[in-house]
Amino acid sequence: AKNVEARPLQAFFNRKQVVTDLFFPWLTAKAPEQVGGWWSNKVTRYGYTYLSRNFGQVYVMTAKMPRTPKNWHGEKDNPSDYDMRYASICTGGSLTAASTPDCIYDEQLAASADDTGRYALVISRQEDRPGNATAQCGVAWIDMGNGDGMVSGSPHFASVINRHTQVHADFKHSWFAVTQPGTEKETMGEYLPYVLNLKEKARFEALGCPVDKSKLWAMLPK
């Protein structure tokens, strides 16, 4: 769609890679070693990207929703019935502050999925939140946060991460399956999250209630 930036998340491999990507992207290794760190470990991998309120006040994150167990209330589950044990999306501050303004987990996020299986998650500050960025209008929302969390830092910086935990061996479209930077789309397909920059809340509010998600999906790259 015109004037909409659609950015995919990228796979996390190690801490050095993240710092290099942020400050010296031309030095980023083409085949970084997967050593984990921060939220990445033997059972969890994630993807990430950066946001800035300087460039947009309202973002929408979307991907096809992986199958996860519904057992928040103690329901029993069968491991063969899901793609991964747990998935979540969180916003964050700077690498040093390591703040986490907000998160949403799979059972909450699944409520925003339409009949195509895609979820719609609005990311903004509370004061920028569109009036229709609600569960009643068919979408989820999380707080973007108030900057990088550093003294004299940027009040507009934010990061977003998507976590996959205990992925089923038969599911081949998770962050675990990405072995090289730049292969995320090829590997993850519809499960690769994209962040759409809608810039301001009026543009999202124009999608109505219930939110016309077909117009959001039309903003994604072909």
Residue ranges and their predicted role:
Residues A1-K222:
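A compositional/structural signature for long, glycine/proline-rich flexible linkers
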